[in-house]
Amino acid sequence: MSKYSNLLFSALLALLTTSCYHEVDLDDFKNNEGKNLLTLNSLICPDSVIAVSATRPYFFSDKHNERTYIKGLNILLSINGQECETLTYNESRHLYLSTIKPKQGDIVKVSTVFNDKLVEAYDTIPYRVSLLDLDVKRRGPLAIYTVRDFVFTYSITFDDPTNETNYYFLQWNEVDAQRDVMMGERDFTHELVFQALANDIHETLPGWKPYCAYGLPFSDRGINGQRHTLVLEETVQADRYSGGWRKPEMKRNFKLYAISKQYYQYLVSVLVNQTDDRGLQGGMIDLGIADPIKIYSNISGGIGIWAGYTISQKTINVFDSVGEIPRQ
């Protein structure tokens, strides 16, 4: 997301990300050369120091007890073209850590040498996009899965920045599993941006529907530069055999991640190539490329993902807006 007066950095970033961004088919790496590749993974945001995982690639078909972490690397961190520091390895976390936090709009680069080969990656941390409004309505009881289901329709409004292409990831969940109504089935299918995502994925995976229990990525195609309201639904089963709805609250936390183009393409590649939700769980990334599938990497000289993001979030108690789910 370009907001820089220094056009040289923007031009350099475009050149570098184009040159090092590539599709990886791990079938090609299942040999000695592949086993000697360095896998770098990191998600970078302004809310924390930079943490980098450095491992060897592994395959689920091979015998392995744990990941093979690579120690002793000199990983140099640069921000906006200025060398900042050499990351420090943390033994207990198996991560290389910085002492500084990057800022929104920073171009962040890491570089190291592994087996006499230069390995490096670049990305830009997007600017935060705020959630402006969050509204909810309830319908039901309806006969969908049981004779007593309730559909909650969420309307989430934000302003998409103008004059640039932007990428996002939307996620929502219960806040407290002990007190909140159990999370129902998410429905992304009525929303324009996820319909556009499905159309893109249909080129590779015909029939795919926009669903994932951990949320989904989307771009601003069709809404560029506009104030847009996302429309999402959640179906909660509330028949006498379902106990998850008998809770005192129904708090829901919504997170809108502004993500880089590299991160978006990585997440889409995971959706296309994995048959379950593993790749999008746990903070939107399954660290370490594993199964021999085609997946995208923006690590020059190695494989993995180096990607920036920011978060905006809002929490509501649904019952405050629409009342409690009626008792039978």
Regions found by a protein language model. Name each.
Residues 21-328:
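A sequence/structural signal for flexible, mid-protein segments enriched
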Residues 9-13:
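Hydrophobic helical h-region of N-terminal Sec-dependent signal peptides
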Residues 1-8:
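Bacterial N-terminal signal peptides that target proteins for export
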